[in-house]
Each structure stands twice: as structure tokens, then as C-alpha cells.
């Protein structure tokens, strides 16, 4: 995420979804962090909200994808959510989306597992 673009971020969006083998039986809470690369120069000079990305729309795009169907794994879920952000907001050039799951059972002391995906507009 360089290209000298500005960044907008959302941190700690919690979404309840069905994911992985355990998702057949119960909902899992995932935490999402989003960072988007966007040119904010028009928004700064115009002072119009329509010249920037809508935070609510970004959060809704992620939530809708994660809640709409059961995902086989974190990587697929993150990829689908990142693509939804690009589809929702045409001003966004690049998306970095991280999904974390803190309700995981692994051998050894692990607080969370997660995945980050980066998607670029073509």
C-alpha cells in the first residue's frame, strides 16, 4: 500500500459468522481490520463526504459477505470480504483486510489465529 495514496482504516469490526468445520454447528466471532488505499485529495479540497469512502458502507460490505454464507476457511472469507470492499467503493484502489479468530483450539498457548489478504483494483 504505497503509491503515495492516503489510507482509511477500520479496526476491530466484530462479525458473527459460520466458518470452517466448526461453523456447521455454531457461530464464530471474527474480528476484522480493514485498511484501504484511496486518493483523498478531492475530499480534502471539496469538503464533501461523497468524495471519500463511506465508513459505514465499508463495514457493511465486510459484514454482509461474512454473514451471508458459511466460509470454508479464514483465507477464503477474508478474500471474499476484500473483493466486496473493492466492489462497494469505486474510489478504493487497494484493500488490506485482516481477519482474526480468538476462539480457536490448538495445541499450545495461542490467543488468536488470523490471515491478511491484499487485493488491488485492476
Language-model features: where?
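N-terminal, polar/charged subdomain of small-to-medium soluble alpha/beta proteins
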Residues: 1-122
